[in-house]
Amino acid sequence: MKRAYLLLAAILLIVACATTSAVAAGPDVKTIVTQMKRGLQGPDNAVRIMDLKVISNGSPAVTWKLVQANGNANGAHWILTVVLAPPDARGIAFLDKEETSSTSTVNYAYLPATRRVIEFAPVEGYDAFFATDFSYQDLGFVLLGGGGEKLVGTETRDGKKVYKLEDHPINHPYYSKVISYVATDSLMPVERDFYDRAGKLFKTEHCTIETVDGVPMITKIVMKNVESGNSSEIDVIKVIPNKQIPADIFEPKNLLHIADHPFWKTVTQSQ
């Protein structure tokens, strides 16, 4: 009997070592998180043309035409998102600034109805982006890579082999846990599940990954509020890489008239 227990223990040890080696053979957590972050934010020095749809009771309630510029200027990294249409929403803008010397961000928002540029703290970036199911942070620098992410293992999700990562954000105003499923081949997120402070599933995010010009990228993001059943969708219509972006569009003071900047015509007319 003792020999049988020893044999069983040896087998379990071999299986555990094999599993550990298989996980260890892949990229480390930092690499996975970095690539996931880039996938969600879009490529640097590029412009994304997108549609944002708000879904209520199963039907689209509103659709916004967005442009998003991602680039560097004045010693910082910036992501600017601007609503170009419809007319009643045109000019809504969100500017996210990431200092190159730190991981902290500074957020600016502009609502045409008030004609004011508002600067707010990073913690407020988790608030809803103008009544959609996305937060401001979802449209800016995604706050990942704080060191708390852990690789749980690999599994299959929606027919794709994925890495499963678990994160317990410290002092997060809304989330106690975030589970991410990242495709092993592209390191792009397939799904992310957000749990509230009480540990209940709050939101789910699903991403569609397609290969465009030989490069895997996210072409659709669906954020669903589990409690309300409502959702919001971002469809990436086009990505214009390696684009020279004028530095003045990243100036907070210019947000008041940013929708009329001539730069947007150079990218939207190329569709």
Report residues per predicted region.
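Bacterial N-terminal signal peptides
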Residues: L8-A18
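Gram-negative outer-membrane assembly/targeting C-terminal domains
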Residues: A247-Q271
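Sec/Tat signal peptide C-region and signal peptidase I cleavage site
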Residues: T19-A24
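N-terminal mature ectodomain segment of secretory-pathway/periplasmic proteins
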Residues: P27-A113
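Mature-chain termini and adjacent capping regions
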Residues: A25-G26, L52-S59, L144, H168, ...
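Bacterial N-terminal signal peptides that target proteins for export
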Residues: M1-A9
